[in-house]
A protein has these predicted regions:
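Fe(II)/2-oxoglutarate oxygenase catalytic core
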Residues: 1-122, 126-192
């Protein structure tokens, strides 16, 4: 969370891990399945995508300028888009972050700035990233895949499919396509 912020407006739709570690549909997905399906269809219908983007979950955010972090429980391959009447709020992303160093040691010169308001942005959520400060109202969607999604019950996975989710199959098809678009991180040592 940003400094001096006590809460953020953020929810996850799709799959999540329960407190005991099982993979389940979030309560908001069960309650608002048509809304979830609409967000899934939005991504599926994007003309910029060459292939259906594989994911299990969507993080929905309002006015959240995330500090530099690496996502936990995210297999990495992520797609994001932001909306609203705001200025700033780009995604800063370190494509060569290998997750080994401390976040405070990252150099701004090694990052990319992605305009998620103008375009969808593909990034690896397990690598360092943050949202730059903004003015106005900013909404964002982050499509990602949770670890262990394949252990979800069949009826849960079937429910996702009925909501237009293209489930990831790690060694084939779209998952391989998008993973290969993200070059392997070089790490901090490669920059020395």
């Amino acid at each position: 969370m940003p400094e001096n912020v006590t809460h953020v407006c953020s929810d996850t739709l799709g799959l999540t891990r329960s407190r005991v570690g099982t993979v389940v549909l979030t309560k908001h997905t069960r309650k608002y399945s048509q809304y979830f399906a609409l967000l899934c269809k939005f991504l599926k219908d994007c003309p910029e995508l060459c292939q259906d983007f594989p994911f299990t979950s969507i993080s929905t955010n309002f006015d959240y300028a995330a500090r530099t972090h690496r996502d936990s429980n995210n297999k990495g391959v992520s797609m994001t888009k932001s909306f609203g009447a705001f200025i700033g709020g780009q995604l800063r992303y370190w494509p060569d972050d290998d997750g080994e160093g401390e976040l405070r040691a990252l150099r701004k010169a090694d990052s990319l700035t992605l305009d998620t308001k103008a375009n969808l942005a593909l990034f690896d959520g397990a690598r360092a990233h943050c949202v730059l400060p903004f003015l106005g109202e900013r909404y964002s969607l982050v499509y990602f895949t949770i670890e262990g999604h394949e252990r979800a019950p069949k009826e849960t996975l079937d429910k996702l499919r009925t909501c237009h989710v293209s489930l990831p199959v790690p060694a084939s098809g779209a998952w391989k396509y998008y993973t290969q678009m993200l070059s392997p991180p070089k790490g901090a040592r490669a920059k020395s």
